[in-house]
Amino acid sequence: MITAMGDVMRRAYEKGWITTRDGNISLRRKGSNIFYVTPSGWRKTIIHPEHMIKVRLIPAGLEILDNHAEPSGELSMHSRLQRYHKRTRAVVHLHPTNIIAAMYAGWDLQTLASEFPEVSRYTRVGPSVPVLPVTSDELANATF
């Protein structure tokens, strides 16, 4: 499971969906209050299981169980999605240039997905999020 996180990030880089240092992923086993998240600032093309940061969801917030590196700056977003969307077990945050271009062109991606069943059949299109400060709680809150 954790090995797949690095595989996903390498594949995302190969497809041009992220640069070597952006994008992040978190993954949680079914029924667990522990999830793993990519570290901040690491090159995503060389990330491996031992680099992942182990985080526990606790009632008062989060408990970082590994301190060998800083967790992703988007930890707030990952933890909210992992905590409040019970069916969510993986959060993949990428920056595909075609999606970013479509958003800046004013396209509503949810409408587009609803008009093309082949899109909604294979992926879940979340709401478009406005441009907000990176790693901010404001950005994390907008992902709901």
Predicted region positions:
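Glycine-rich flexible loops
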Residues: 1-144
